[in-house]
Amino acid sequence: MEARFVHGKILRNAGSGIFYRMEVAIPERIDFVPGQFAMVSGWPGNDPLLPRPLAIFRSGGARGHGTVEFVYKVVGRGTALLSGLHAGDPLALTLPLGHGFEFPGEDRSWWLVGGGVGFSSVFPVAAALEGERADFEIFLGASTAGSCPAPA
């Protein structure tokens, strides 16, 4: 799928501590390959200048409208600004970007490993493997027991 620039509107942006989960309404549904990402910005002005890369956690939608979800960690000024946005706030997104993960066609068992906020790329892979009825195990790591949020 070819990347495109879209304007979105935040449906929810909730978090606890340094991890946040953001759901965004976009004009049309996007298909993505697990491992792809978006460049996201939503603050006024040019400071910071560059949008922030966020892994696509999930996408959905119907009837010409779409949604895209991100799980992100506040690590600097840009993600701190994103964490302060609320439902209804506008965003600018370029997506989907990157090649994503490739899955060999042969039958095998998979170990999916993610650490910290990197877990957000593991779950789209698990969903793809589940659709193929593949065997897999998920291993998540974090610096503390409470610092790796489990998705709903």
Q: Residues of each region from the PLM?
A:
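FNR/FR-type flavoprotein reductase catalytic core
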Residues: 77-152
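Ferredoxin-reductase
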Residues: 1-87, 143
